[in-house]
Structures are given as structure tokens and as C-alpha cells.
Design a protein with these regions (language model features):
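Loop/turn position at the start of each blade in beta-propeller repeats
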Residues: 159, 167, 193, 201, ...
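Blade-loop segments of beta-propeller domains
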Residues: 148-170, 185-211
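Surface loop/turn motifs at the tips and blade-to-blade linkers of beta-strand repeat domains
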Residues: 153-156, 195-200, 205, 261-264, ...
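Short coil/turn segments that connect the beta-strands within blades of beta-propeller domains
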Residues: 124-125, 168-169, 177-178, 210-211, ...
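N-terminal mitochondrial targeting presequence
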Residues: 1-88
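Short glycine/serine- and acidic-residue-enriched loop/turn motifs that recur at repeat junctions
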Residues: 70-123, 127-149, 181-199, 223-256, ...
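Conserved core positions of repeat-based scaffolds
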Residues: 129, 170-173, 182, 212-215, ...
Length: 606
């Protein structure tokens, strides 16, 4: 085959047929239609985009014009910060009370209100007082009739006192040197600051009556001083020896020395207690003397304890001369106490003798309206209080005031025929001591502290909240009874300091969490003059706690501690050798004194 023939054959083979040409034309038409459809859709989307942009621009312009109109011609609004609304009950999280930036003492203050109270009592010693101020005793520089809550008496700021006694009309105190300080309307109506009166006698304790002050000196002398400055100036002033040899002169004020003259060798007066008209003098050898203690009235309700002794039958000599209570001879009397018109004496064996007025049952004997006076010491029946309880009672303390009497009792558990000797629980109870407190007398103002308002209570009534208390002692690893450290009784109210475990050894050398704490103290009874210190006027028939004395400092402490208000109670500072605010080192403790319609807590020493 020639080359020309081959070329024609190849050309013929490459030439498409009619079916192939038709399919090609159809495909080209489809592609052309698809391209036209895509261009149409793109055109529509572009048109929609232009319309959207126009709408947004129009809306923005309208908003700008509105903002321009609202903001007084300014396109930019002037913003002001607004505080968020406060929640009704916001959730407060307590922060850590110990902060590295705080000192050791600041951290301890935040940890414990009790530690703060103890520290403040050392830094700022003085006197807090409250109650009736009709005689300007509680607040000498104020004309307020009552002081509802504890308030400091500025004169005593920084001072330590040996003793203090308060009547609604006059007050008396002994400073650290043993000098007598007096104030109040009953002393001088125009004097609004305490005055030092009897000096140089080294007084250690005080007792007051209707219008006189009895001061006991360190050497055992008993001085009877008029409460009134006028009487001090007008009554006979005794001769006094001077430190200059062979030189003597009259005292600056009038007073009487009523120390018994027939004391034995080495015997001296160790304690004095007084009512409105009488006083009891206890000697170091357990003897008891009684004497009249008011200037204008002689005791007539048997409170002297000497049968038949009256103003008409009194022996020759001074009206206030002491008389030995011979009925108590042979009993070693350890403590004495006086109410307004009655007397109590406790001997070393735990027996109590009572005499005087029994109109409210304050002697603990059955009430007899035909014979309300007992003029000789009589033994208080005690066994019936523990009848059938397998306990042996022993009275450990007596206190009295107004028309009330109080006793504290240690009751020891003993074996009885009813006990099962094989019961180990019974064996553990043998020898267990329970400390109880009883009250008797007038309860109409709540002084019985038993939740009742009894007019006459002749049988001693147990005070539930001050009886049968125990705590764990870490030093002895045992449970011990909580007794009363001190009981102060006023005319219608009382206060008790508990003998619970206290601690005052926290120092720079102990741990950061080591804090001091004081003793519990409670108040109860009449409150008509706000003498309980609660800030309210209702009487209390149950012992109650008070707020801390220095509430201003307590509020500041609470703000640093938790940032919120905290509720704490007053704890009284126990005896300790401490550094005071002025740098002095002294034995000091806080003491409570209930008087006639008023109360005081003071920094005591000696």
C-alpha cells in the first residue's frame, strides 16, 4: 500500500460519525445553560448584599441621630459609675483571723475576746460602776439618775484599790497605800470628785452601814468614820501621834477606834462585816464581837447576838463599844456575814449559826409571824437538805445582804446500805464531791436565783445554775467540781464569780495561739435601778451574764477579727502578777462589789 493510501485511511478513521457530533453539541448547550444560571444567581446575591448594606447604613444613621438628640447634642454619652445594688442577705466568708502583718498580741486578741479582756484589765486598771446614781456615787461628775451599763469612774483610772464599798448615797474605797477615799452626795453634796480623807492608817478592808464606814487596818485596828464630811469636821477628832518624837496632834477628821480591848496576846481583828445598824468583828482566834455601827439608831432586832441587849440595857461606855458573843465561845469561827438586820457565822467544821431578823426567812428557820426575831446564835439545820441522798454536806462559805443569805456546800458521796457493792459505777461515785449553792430569804425580786419569785423562803433553796457543776482539769486528768470563788451580795441583788479553771500565763515565749482567759461571773436579783448592768430594768430570777465591760474596745476588736458584730460575755480577770499600763509590776485582779442599788468592778490588789 502506497503512502497516500495510508494517509487517506488514517484521515477517514479520525473523522467522527453523526452520533458523536450530536452528543458533543448537547454537552455544549448544557454547559452554556449552567453558566447562564450561575451568572444569574451571582447577580441576585450581589443585589441582596447591596440592599443589606443600605439597610444597615440607614439604621446606623437613625441610631446616631437619636443618640445625638438624647445626649443633648453630643455623639458620645458621658458615663457615670453606679454602685451595684446591695444584696438583702449577703454571703460573708470569714477570713483567717491570724495575719502575718499583725503582732503576736493582735492575733491573740482576734482569736479570743477573753484574752483581750484580760489584757485590757491590766493595761487600764480602774473602776467600772453602774446602777443608781441618785447620790452621784456611780458617776460622781454626772447628774444622771441611773447608769444603765458599766461606766468608768475617771478618778480611779490607772489606780489599784484594796477595797471598795458602795451605798446609793456615798462611796468609800481604799487606795494602794491604805488611805480612805470618799465621794457622793452623802459625803458632800457640792463635791463631784472623790476625796482622800483618812490617811496613814494602812487600811486593808472596808464595810459600810447606814451612815458610817468601818475600816480594818493591817495591824487589826477597827476605825469607825462618819460618812459625812460635815460630821467628820464637827465630831470630836482624836489625838494622833506624829513621826516626830514627843509630838502629837489632832486628826484631820473625826473617827472612833472600836477595836475590842480584851483581846488575848497575839489576837487581832481579821475581818469585819456590817449591816445597816450593826457590825461583826472576827478575831484571828475565831472569836466574834458585835457592835452598833450607825450614829442615830441602836440595833433592836437581835442582830447583835447578845440576848437582852438594848439601848436601855447597854453597859456604860461608848454606844458603839464591841460586845463578845459568848454563845459562840468554843466554836472556831472562820467567817462572818451581815445582812441589813441579821447575822451569820461559819465555823471551821462547816456549821452555820444565824441570828437577828427572820421576817423573810433569811435565817433559814421556819417563819413565825409572832416571833420574827432570834436574838442568840442558833445552828442552821442542814442535814434535811440532803436527806436520802447518800451525801455528807459541809458548808464552805456564807454571804449575806439585804434580806437574803447564801451558803455554799461541798457534798461528799458516801456508801449507803442501798448501794450495790459489786456495781463498779457505784464504787466510782464514792468520795465524789459536788459543790452546791443555796439561797434563802426574800425572793420577790429574784434574789433566790431559782426562777421563782417567792416572798418568804425560810428553807434554803438550791440555785440550779450554780450547783452540781464540773469541768475537766488537764493538770490532774480528772473531773473537778466548779465552786464559787467569790459571792457579793447587795441590798437586793448579787453576783457570783465561778472558780473555774483560768489561765494568765500567755507571753511572748508561748505559742501564737496561747491565750489568757478569766473566770465566769453572773448577776441576778433586783434591777429596778439598773444595778445588774444588763441595760434593761427587769429583775432577774436566774443568774445572767453581762457583755464585756469595755464595749468600745470590744467592738474594735471584733471588727479586726471578723469584720462583724460578735457576742461575747464578761469574764473577770483572776489574780496574777502582771505588767500594768504604766509599766509597774503588781499583783492584781478584778473584783466585783454589789452595794445598795449599785454595782462596781474594780482592779484590786493586796
Amino acid at each position: 500500500m502506497s503512502s497516500k493510501q495510508v494517509a487517506r485511511a488514517a484521515t477517514k478513521a479520525a473523522k467522527p460519525s453523526n452520533g458523536t457530533r450530536n452528543a458533543s453539541r448537547l454537552a455544549q448547550q448544557v454547559e452554556r445553560v449552567a453558566a447562564l444560571s450561575y451568572q444569574a444567581r451571582a447577580t441576585r446575591k450581589q443585589t441582596q448584599l447591596r440592599r443589606s448594606i443600605f439597610a444597615v447604613v440607614a439604621a446606623g444613621g437613625l441610631a446616631t441621630a437619636s443618640q445625638f438628640y438624647i445626649n443633648n447634642g453630643n455623639f458620645v454619652r458621658q458615663g457615670h459609675a453606679e454602685a451595684p445594688e446591695k444584696e438583702e442577705n449577703p454571703l460573708v466568708f470569714e477570713e483567717s483571723r491570724k495575719k502575718k502583718s499583725n503582732s503576736l498580741e493582735e492575733n491573740r486578741d482576734m482569736i479570743s475576746s477573753q484574752h483581750h479582756q484580760v489584757k485590757r484589765s491590766w493595761e487600764k486598771p480602774g473602776v467600772y460602776a453602774w446602777g443608781s446614781n441618785s447620790g452621784r456615787v456611780v458617776a460622781p461628775d454626772s447628774d444622771e439618775r441611773v447608769i444603765k451599763t458599766p461606766r468608768r469612774i475617771p478618778y480611779f483610772d490607772g489606780m489599784l484599790l484594796r477595797d471598795i464599798k458602795l451605798d446609793r448615797n456615798f462611796g468609800a474605797a481604799i487606795d494602794e497605800r491604805g488611805d480612805l477615799i470618799q465621794w457622793g452626795v452623802g459625803y458632800a453634796a457640792d463635791v463631784k470628785t472623790p476625796v482622800r480623807t483618812l490617811e496613814g492608817k494602812d487600811l486593808t478592808s472596808l464595810s459600810i452601814s447606814k451612815d458610817r464606814i468601818l475600816g480594818l487596818s493591817k495591824n487589826g485596828n477597827v476605825y469607825s468614820i462618819p460618812a459625812s464630811a460635815e460630821d467628820q469636821a464637827n465630831d470630836p477628832q482624836p489625838q494622833e501621834s506624829s513621826w516626830v518624837p514627843f509630838w502629837s496632834g489632832k486628826s484631820k477628821i473625826a473617827y472612833r477606834n472600836i477595836t475590842p480591848q480584851n483581846l488575848s496576846r497575839g489576837e487581832k481583828i481579821s475581818a469585819v462585816s456590817s449591816g445597816l445598824e450593826h457590825a461583826l468583828l472576827l478575831t484571828s482566834k475565831g472569836r466574834v464581837f458585835s457592835a452598833a455601827s450607825a450614829s442615830d439608831v441602836f440595833p433592836s432586832r437581835g442582830q447583835l447576838g447578845v440576848p437582852g441587849l438594848t439601848w436601855l440595857t447597854r453597859p456604860e461606855g461608848a454606844f458603839d463599844q464591841p460586845h463578845e458573843i459568848t454563845t459562840l465561845r468554843g466554836f472556831n469561827i472562820a467567817k462572818v456575814a451581815c445582812g441589813d438586820h441579821h447575822s451569820l457565822a461559819l465555823d471551821s467544821e462547816g456549821r452555820v449559826f444565824a441570828w437577828g431578823d427572820n421576817a423573810s426567812g433569811q435565817l433559814g428557820f421556819d417563819y413565825n409571824p409572832e416571833s420574827m426575831i432570834v436574838d442568840a446564835p442558833s445552828l442552821l439545820p442542814l442535814q434535811k437538805l440532803y436527806s436520802g441522798k447518800s451525801q455528807t454536806p459541809k458548808i464552805t462559805h456564807v454571804a449575806a445582804g439585804g434580806e437574803n443569805s447564801y451558803i455554799t456546800v461541798d457534798a461528799t458521796r458516801v456508801a449507803s446500805p442501798k448501794d450495790d457493792g459489786l456495781d463498779p459505777r457505784t464504787q466510782l461515785q464514792i468520795g465524789r464531791v459536788t459543790a452546791d449553792t443555796f439561797a434563802f430569804g426574800s425572793g420577790i425580786r429574784g434574789a433566790l436565783a431559782n426562777s421563782r419569785w417567792t416572798h418568804v423562803q425560810s428553807t434554803p433553796s438550791k440555785i440550779p445554775s450554780l450547783s452540781g457543776l464540773f469541768e475537766y482539769d488537764e493538770k490532774t486528768n480528772s473531773t473537778v467540781p466548779i465552786r464559787l470563788q467569790h459571792l457579793s451580795v447587795g441590798s437586793t441583788h448579787a453576783a457570783a464569780v465561778m472558780q473555774n479553771i483560768t489561765y494568765t500565763d500567755a507571753s511572748q515565749h508561748t505559742s501564737n495561739d496561747d491565750t489568757n482567759w478569766g473566770a465566769d461571773i453572773v448577776f441576778w436579783g433586783g434591777n429596778e435601778h439598773y444595778q445588774l448592768g444588763t441595760g434593761k430594768r427587769n429583775n432577774m430570777s436566774e443568774p445572767t451574764y453581762l457583755q464585756p465591760l469595755d464595749m468600745e474596745a470590744e467592738v474594735k476588736r471584733a471588727r479586726k477579727s471578723s469584720g462583724a458584730k460578735e457576742e461575747h460575755r464578761f469574764h473577770i480577770t483572776p489574780r496574777a502578777y502582771a505588767t500594768l499600763g504604766d509599766g509597774r509590776r503588781r499583783w492584781v485582779e478584778q473584783r466585783v462589789e454589789c452595794g445598795r442599788h449599785c454595782t462596781a468592778v474594780y482592779s484590786g490588789t493586796g
